[in-house]
Swiss-Prot record:
Any one Gene Ontology molecular-function term assigned to this protein's record: ATP binding
UniProt entry keywords in alphabetical sequence: ATP-binding, Kinase, Lipid A biosynthesis, Lipid biosynthesis, Lipid metabolism, Nucleotide-binding, Transferase
Pfam families on file: LpxK
Reactions it catalyzes: a lipid A disaccharide + ATP = a lipid IVA + ADP + H(+)
GO CC, one annotated term: plasma membrane
Protein name: Tetraacyldisaccharide 4'-kinase
Protein purpose: Transfers the gamma-phosphate of ATP to the 4'-position of a tetraacyldisaccharide 1-phosphate intermediate (termed DS-1-P) to form tetraacyldisaccharide 1,4'-bis-phosphate (lipid IVA).
Species assigned in the record: Actinobacillus pleuropneumoniae serotype 7 (strain AP76)
EC class: transferase
Gene for this chain: lpxK
Amino acid sequence: MNIWQSTSIITWLLAPFSLLFWLVSQIRLFLFRKKILKSYRSPVPVLVVGNISVGGNGKTPVVVWLVEQLQQRGVKVGVISRGYGGKSKDFPQLVTNQSSAEMVGDEPVLIVQRTGVPLAISANRQQSIELLLNQFKLDLIVTDDGLQHYALQRDIEWVVVDGIRRFGNGFVLPAGGLRELPSRLQTVQAIICNGGIAHQNEHLMTLEPEFAVNLRTGEQKPITDFIGQECVAIAGIGHPPRFFNMLENLGVKLLKTQGFADHQAFEPAQLKALAAEQIPLLMTEKDAVKCRTFAQQNWWYVPVSAKFSPESTACLLEPILKRLGK
């Protein structure tokens, strides 16, 4: 939300509620740390990929990158997720390539389709972990989001920060977009900066598109084929302008853009009305998993891959591999 990027009269009106939010969260954290509230310790190490702010900071590309890197190094990894946006009431549940994004959420389906990783969804993280460990022999559990879910003990914490928006106006909810104060970053093992300029002790990540994929046929074409071409773009992610800016920076001529709420389900007529049949409709990979059943001929999604420097890659992975004895 733009109002969270600066201070205004609304900010100060909401500030007392932010103070209350912060106090409650601190009391809750204290109770977990003193073991007054129970928390679950997984039999295998747990790595959390999360953030301290609301909205899309790029956690899912980090999870995909991490899973792929670990798989290449022989680590048996599983992923757990809340399954935001899914309608299923059957928890815990394994997500497969045949799972519906409408039922289990768009991000879990995307992660499984990209990596083939064992993945379970549930609001109860313990149930998800137990389901995975009952069916797979795993070395490590990665949790997609859940930094503030202190009912689950963790061994490693990574935080993803939006390198452009950073921490907005610096207030916690509802006056600002923070779930926790930036001082929380002092306690995590890695800070990943998504775009912009990485600050000290942060690892810069860039999200790079290489090709576009047709939703109907699976045809791939270089993203450069769309340079100078008139297109329409949609994005149902935490921060839609990031996707639109990426396309425009590549040279795509966007006639129209439409942002949607994160995890929003799409109606076929809603999207068909946005672009004429001959105009390409570009979307994120996360949106595509919700649109395949009614996709039109000229609809394309643009997958992005997380990229790190060799130095950051080594710095991020070595502590994990050392802990696992790999």
